[in-house]
Amino acid sequence: MKRILFTAGGCLFYLLLAVKAYAYDCSATPAYQDGVNYQSGDLVSNTGAAYRCNVAGWCSTGGAYAPGTGWAWTEAWDELGSCDGGAGSSGSSSSSSSSSSSSSGSSSSSSGSGSSSGGTSCDGIEAWQVASIYTEGNVVQQNGERYIANWWNQGQSPEDNSGAYEVWSAAGSCSGAGSSSSSSGGTSSSGSSSSGVSSSGGSSGGDSPIARHGKLHVCGNGLCNADNVPVQLRGMSTHGLQWYGWGNCITGNSLDTLAEDWNADILRVSLYVQEGGYETDPAGYTAQVSHIIDEVTARGMYVLVDWHQLDPGDPNANLDNARQFFTDIAQAHGDKTNIIYDVANEPNNVSWDAIQRYAMEVIPVIRQYAPDAVVLVGTHGWASLGISDGGSAQDIFNNPVTIDNIMYTFHFYAASHGQVYRDELRSALERGMPVFVTEWGSQTYTGDDGNDFVSTQAYLDLLDQYQISWTNWNYSDDFRTGAVWNTGTCSADSWGVGNLKEAGAWVRDKIRNR
């Protein structure tokens, strides 16, 4: 069955969370209704519990923020306790659970301590084990308390890692000691779980990309690790989150596959601004990006947050939205060492000087909360260093972004972009430009048609020569040849190599074999 956090996976999560911290008189508390314009301080009842609105805009959004059921509800509401009967309008507020209200919206973790007055039996719930692997929804007990895993983890004690933005959620006290066998438990290091995770895989413990390289910084043409050794990251890009995001092609199982089987270093998270993307639901899409960041981080990979502006091509048209989005994401995740930010996907039909002005406006927003983060700037001509718009890399050399620790992006589709584009890229690299290839394909610029692996290999050889990091487009089952998975793979949540398209098998090999 496909794992969707806010449906199948969410049911388990919130059902088990139904053991509330304290009783609350809901007789005068109105029932929650989707679509109502709730204000901060408003009280509602839902799923047998009382809640108080904490962030007005998100309380009114519904869906992911519906109290007690949405996967990001803890970002909008404080839980006041279990209803001891009834539902109606204005009950008094007792102490709230400590759910975080960061403006970014993020993970599904609950922050309350969840200890009930009498407790619930923990018979059949296994004790947490340091060597076991746990995935979303797994339930354990530790020192008389129950906990639910929010995402993949190993060796992270529930007692020390539960709460908002943590890998575990507290789910109440145990009334009994409990036994050590349960179908909801994790996987021992010698076995395999239902999601196919094994502790011997590349992303666990000290063998993950983050563990190997630590915090990255720009050096020369590319990236260096914490020891100042050049690093080339190889990985994948999502398709648009509005079509193929969390719960569709991006699931716990698909990320396990990317980390454990493909041995990828990085996932680019592509948030479209238009085309049904961010501007239609800023809070919802911010929460989705934030949750994916947590999921990818838990698997030991780097995350490239991609502000996927495309049409209009001038990034300044989305300047206010960009400021808000990057404020929210950087504020929530600025303390992480594995986040790279791309402030403009493919600027087009706009001068480099206009892009440079935009970058000088947006990068300080990120640096306010993530002062050492690597930031990428999209180049003109659909990230072609200007070639596709009649410009060149010289435009960038004439007016560079005068902020440290930044890189410029280059995109190619090998069946469309031949030697002229490679020559311009090589020239820019020879002159010392720091470059990250955040999107490429072996097809035409439409992401479709036949694969030109000869031209593609010529590009990859050049990137290897200069240790240039890259992410391939795209990790979905879209019908086009550039999507790595066959149509239907995502709905089946089955990620074996037999489901790969020709280009998918090819790029998997390039990621695995260095």
Swiss-Prot record:
InterPro entries: CBM5/12, CBM_sf_5/12, Glyco_hydro_5, Glyco_hydro_5_CS, Glycoside_hydrolase_SF. The active site is at E346, E439. SMART domains: ChtBD3. GO terms for cellular component: extracellular region. Coiled coil: none annotated. CDD domains: ChiC_BD (cd12215). The halophilic feature and the tolerance to a broad range of pH and surfactants would favor the industrial application of MaCel5A in diverse environments. Optimum temperature is 50 degrees Celsius with CMC-Na as substrate. Thermostable: retains 59% of its residual activity after exposure to 70 degrees Celsius for 30 minutes and 49% of its activity after exposure to 80 degrees Celsius for 30 minutes. Exhibits strong halostability and halotolerance. The activity increases about tenfold in the presence of 0.5 M NaCl, and about fivefold in the presence of 4.0 M NaCl. Tolerates detergents, but activity is decreased in the presence of EDTA. Activity is enhanced in the presence of Mn(2+), Ca(2+), Ba(2+) or Mg(2+), and decreased in the presence of Zn(2+), Cu(2+), Al(3+) or Fe(3+). One of its GO terms (biological process) is polysaccharide catabolic process. Residues 1-23 form the signal peptide. The keyword Kinase does not apply. Pfam families: CBM_5_12 (PF02839), Cellulase (PF00150). Residues 91-114, 179-201 have a biased composition (Low complexity). GO terms for molecular function: carbohydrate binding; hydrolase activity, hydrolyzing O-glycosyl compounds. Keywords: Carbohydrate metabolism, Glycosidase, Hydrolase, Signal. Belongs to the glycosyl hydrolase 5 (cellulase A) family. Endoglucanase that exhibits highest activity toward barley beta-glucan, lower activity toward carboxymethyl cellulose (CMC-Na), and marginal activity toward laminarin and xylan. This is Endoglucanase MaCel5A.
